[in-house]
Amino acid sequence: MECKTVFLNGDFLKNSVNVNLNRLATVETLLRHVLGDSYETVLERAYLTHQSRIVHPDIQLCKLEGKSTSAHLNLTLCTRVLGGKGGFGSQLRAAGGRMSKKRNEQENQDSCRDLDGNRLGTIRQAKELSEYLAKKPAETRAKKEAKKQKLNKVLAADSSSSRFDDHEYLEDLEQSVSNVRDAFQNSLLYRRGSTSASSFSSGSNGATTDEPAEKEARNNNSSINSWSRRMQASESSNEAEGEDSESQTSKSLYEWDDPLYGL
């Protein structure tokens, strides 16, 4: 019967122990032979390793040989270490995932290339351009429709800059202006008459004093005439602006209705 020499060392042994056992014997038999009846208590506080691998007590010695041709085995009895509550590995994985996500957000990978040799930045720009070109016709149609509806709404509603057609008020205004003009002229004539009377009583200096009064009357008449001309010009300009706005609105609608306008 072939035997196997086993060297056993560890924390529970003062010195290394060598034992010759049958190759078919188990590790439990080895521990019972070395430690006696207390081997069960020792196994609760320690475990066996062979070539940095944990060995179960029920395994046979011949199965530990493997491809080794050595005539002996080295087993180590290691003390068990109390573990923590666990979960530390999952915390590390979660922290690593957050770090990698943050790193990917901060890094600019546009200069990197894919397996086909195309830059990632070029691919991203092409994708954005295709999406923009796909949405552009719909946006253009929506803008044109909104503009057309706005013009139709302006035409349908009452214009805020409508013409002032109160003829009675205009006649009263013209009459008031003419009355003011007549009163002003009468006052000038009265002043000129009083001035001429005083100059006649003064003697030969009357002819010279009449001339400034006549000049002042002429200047006042010219100022009244210029004021009335400005009033008429402003009224005519308001009428012209109203006609221009109506023609411009109709022209814009004609451009929308006729697609060949301006070609």
Curated annotation (Swiss-Prot):
Presence of keyword Nucleus: yes
Membership in a protein family: Belongs to the SDE2 family.
Annotated stretches, region: Disordered: 95-118, 137-158, 194-263
Subunit text: Interacts with cay1/cactin. Interacts with prp19. Interacts with cwf12. Interacts with cdc5.
Residues making up the propeptide: 1-84
Entry annotated with the keyword Cytoplasm: yes
Phenotype caused by lack of the gene: Leads to abnormal splicing of introns featuring long spacing between the branchpoint and 3'-splice site. Disrupts association of cay1/cactin with spliceosomes. Sensitive to genotoxic stress by hydroxyurea, valproic acid, sodium butyrate, and cadmium. Sensitive to cold and thermal stress; simultaneous knockout of tls1 exacerbates the growth defect.
Subcellular location(s) per record: Cytoplasm; Nucleus
Function of the molecule: Plays a role in pre-mRNA splicing by facilitating excision of introns featuring relatively long (>21 nucleotides) spacing between the branchpoint and 3'-splice site (ss). Recruits cactin to the spliceosome which may enable folding of RNA between the branchpoint and 3'-ss, to guide the splice site towards the spliceosome's catalytic center. Required for proper chromatin organization by assisting splicing of components involved in genomic stability and telomere organization.
Keywords: Cell cycle, Cytoplasm, mRNA processing, mRNA splicing, Nucleus, Ubl conjugation
Lineage: Eukaryota, Fungi, Dikarya, Ascomycota, Taphrinomycotina
GO cellular component, one term: post-mRNA release spliceosomal complex
Compositional bias per record (Low complexity), positions renumbered to this chain: 194-209, 219-230
Protein name: Splicing regulator sde2
Domain of life, per lineage: Eukaryota
GO BP annotation list: alternative mRNA splicing, via spliceosome; mRNA cis splicing, via spliceosome
Residue spans of biased composition, Basic and acidic residues class: 102-117
Post-translational modification note: The N-terminal UBL (ubiquitin-like) propeptide is cleaved at Gly-84 by the deubiquitinating enzymes ubp5 and ubp15; the resulting mature sde2 associates with spliceosomes.
Protein source organism: Schizosaccharomyces pombe (strain 972 / ATCC 24843) (Fission yeast)
InterPro entries per the UniProt record, alphabetical: RNA_Proc_DNA_Dmg_Regulator (IPR051421), SDE2-like_dom (IPR053822), Sde2_N (IPR024974)
